[in-house]
């Protein structure tokens, strides 16, 4: 919008605030939940051009002949909810489908780095995503990733962000912070990262962090970087220490990590005064959970059930995030000048959302979007992103000396999505090929570069999955989104990977040469335009298929896709090879050969 148009619109908003222009919409007969003052009292709200222009006992002066009036029927008027940290692409829903999923549950704003998109289509490709977001009843506050790739050592993605690119991004008006600054990059004094952080200081751009299990001197060292927000506390003592040391902490309750019950103890058992410095996020959430449980509204209910007062829980889902991310001039509270993202809630204890207004318009009622949102026409840049030749079964054979009879291997033992330890296993060797043994709970794991850069492929061993047969694979695997495949049969592993290459992305489970379940991800190989309900059914199909090949993990496919993240201790695997996340180096999974 050019300056003259902005000035005209700005003048109109000011006039509307002075009741010199009639409101577009008025909410009457409601109880305002004032998250700034922790009060609840009768109030009316006037809205003009998507902005709140008045919050008073009586806004009759703002009503014109064409003003729409909503009777709140004594329901509670609550600010729209804010997800304080989310890799929205991990839902496998496009931005449009994701908005359809979460807006009826009261989520009207999200904080995201859109880093999964960047790994595939680059920063320039985000222009298409921002166009899509502009048409949605949901706001995205974008934090530009501190660098890409995040992995140490650096793995392969389609497009890299370094400090030079970051310096340019920090000048953009749509960049609200530096996203996901991992502690290891600070600890190792990575100069490119440090340049970005110094630029952020100069440009007054807030830095958002990622520091799991950082306490004591590790935390002190990390905080010298200028980080102000962190979403990685594994227990309530860690959360408390971080708040005491000046961090705004975001409690994560995702589809794969459930930290709310433990983290909330810092408020309910230790010090309730810290609550205003704590907020919520879902980080990585799938469609099944959104459809079956809700989104931020679910977290509010969990907090209330854990003993948090409803007002406090609502603050954690609204104003706390807004203040932590310095966007409280736009969202997080119901006050003049703020965006008109508003919920009508019938019961604060049950936190039952009856109506959602976003950008000043009623968009959802009783948990359902008022009308389906049209999907944009997708450009060619978002399709055909799997640039990889077909593979063979022999690509999934781990070769050692031809005269070897057995090997001792170090497996990446999964004890949950964000807990991975080393476990030693002994495997037999036949004709120089290590034999994968399901009876010993060992599977082969491989990551294949899929951007046409170098053709990298890694091989390693993993345990804890109880696979009995077959394989499963995905082109959506944060934060690099290369192809990851796990299996106990080379032929099935090759079939799984080739299926993803041929079908331009998705997730697949195979066994005995047959495809048991396939979930298509045609947009950048990471997301889909189907409805949330449709994707939830597809996810359930993948889950049942992975259970059919023996896995007893809660969500095997989702858990597997996190194996390339090197910020999660202790071990990972990328297209470069097996990674010791503590030493930040590659390691050979073969320990001994006999």
UniProtKB/Swiss-Prot annotation:
Keyword Manganese annotated: yes
Assigned EC number: 3.5.4.2
One BP term from GO: adenine catabolic process
Coiled coil regions in record: none
Keyword Cell wall biogenesis/degradation included in the entry's annotation: no
Reactions accelerated catalytically: adenine + H2O + H(+) = hypoxanthine + NH4(+)
Protein family according to the UniProt entry: Belongs to the metallo-dependent hydrolases superfamily. Adenine deaminase family.
Name this protein carries in UniProt: Adenine deaminase 1
């Amino acid at each position: 919008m050019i300056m003259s148009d902005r000035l005209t619109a700005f003048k109109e908003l000011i006039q509307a605030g002075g009741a010199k222009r009639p409101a577009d919409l008025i909410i009457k007969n409601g109880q305002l939940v004032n998250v700034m003052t922790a009060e609840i009292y009768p109030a009316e709200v006037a809205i003009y051009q998507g902005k709140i222009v008045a919050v008073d006992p009586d806004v009759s002066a703002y009503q014109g002949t064409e003003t729409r009036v909503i009777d709140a029927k004594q329901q509670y008027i609550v600010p729209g909810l804010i997800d304080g940290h989310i890799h929205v692409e991990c839902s496998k829903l496009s931005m449009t489908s994701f908005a359809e999923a979460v807006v009826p549950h009261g989520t009207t704003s999200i904080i995201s780095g859109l880093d999964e998109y960047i790994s595939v289509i680059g920063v320039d490709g985000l222009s298409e995503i921002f166009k899509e977001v502009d048409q949605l009843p949901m706001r995205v506050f974008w934090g530009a990733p501190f660098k890409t790739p995040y992995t140490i050592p650096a793995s392969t993605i389609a497009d890299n962000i370094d400090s030079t690119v970051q310096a340019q991004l920090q000048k953009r008006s749509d960049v609200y912070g530096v996203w996901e600054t991992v502690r290891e990059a600070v600890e190792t004094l990575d100069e490119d990262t440090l340049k970005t952080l110094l630029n952020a200081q100069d440009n007054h751009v807030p830095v958002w962090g990622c520091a799991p299990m950082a306490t004591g001197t590790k935390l002190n060292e990390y905080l010298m970087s200028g980080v102000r927000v962190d979403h990685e506390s594994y227990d309530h003592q860690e959360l408390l220490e971080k708040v005491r040391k000046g961090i705004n902490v975001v409690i994560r309750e995702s589809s794969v990590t459930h930290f709310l019950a433990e983290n909330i103890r810092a408020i309910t058992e230790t010090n309730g005064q810290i609550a205003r410095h704590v907020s919520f996020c879902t980080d990585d959430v799938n469609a099944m959970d959104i459809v079956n449980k809700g989104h931020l509204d679910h977290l509010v209910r969990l907090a209330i059930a854990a003993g948090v007062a409803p007002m406090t829980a609502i603050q954690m889902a609204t104003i706390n995030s807004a203040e932590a991310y310095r966007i409280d001039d736009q969202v997080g509270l119901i006050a003049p000048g703020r965006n008109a993202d508003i919920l009508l809630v019938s019961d604060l204890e049950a936190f039952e959302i009856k109506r959602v207004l976003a950008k000043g318009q009623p968009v959802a009622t009783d948990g359902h979007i008022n009308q389906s949102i049209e999907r944009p026409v997708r450009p060619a840049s978002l399709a055909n992103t799997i640039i990889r030749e077909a593979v063979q079964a022999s690509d999934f054979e781990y070769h050692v000396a031809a005269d070897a009879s057995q090997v001792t291997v170090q497996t990446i033992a999964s004890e949950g999505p964000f807990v991975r330890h080393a476990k030693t296993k002994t495997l037999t060797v036949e004709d120089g090929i290590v034999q994968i043994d399901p009876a010993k709970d060992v599977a082969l794991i491989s990551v294949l570069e899929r951007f046409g850069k170098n053709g990298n492929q890694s091989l390693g061993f993993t345990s804890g999955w109880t696979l009995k047969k077959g394989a499963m694979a995905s082109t959506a695997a944060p934060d690099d989104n290369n192809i990851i495949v796990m299996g106990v049969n080379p032929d099935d592993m090759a079939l799984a990977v080739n299926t993803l290459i041929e079908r331009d992305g998705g997730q697949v489970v195979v066994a005995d040469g047959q495809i048991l379940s396939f979930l298509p991800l045609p947009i950048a190989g990471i997301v889909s335009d189907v409805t949330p309900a449709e994707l939830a059914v597809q996810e359930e199909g993948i889950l049942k298929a992975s259970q059919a090949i023996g896995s007893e993990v809660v969500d095997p496919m989702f858990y597997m896709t996190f194996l390339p993240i090197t910020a999660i201790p202790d071990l990972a695997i990328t297209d470069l090879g097996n990674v010791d996340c503590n030493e930040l180096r590659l390691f050979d999974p073969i320990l001994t050969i006999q």
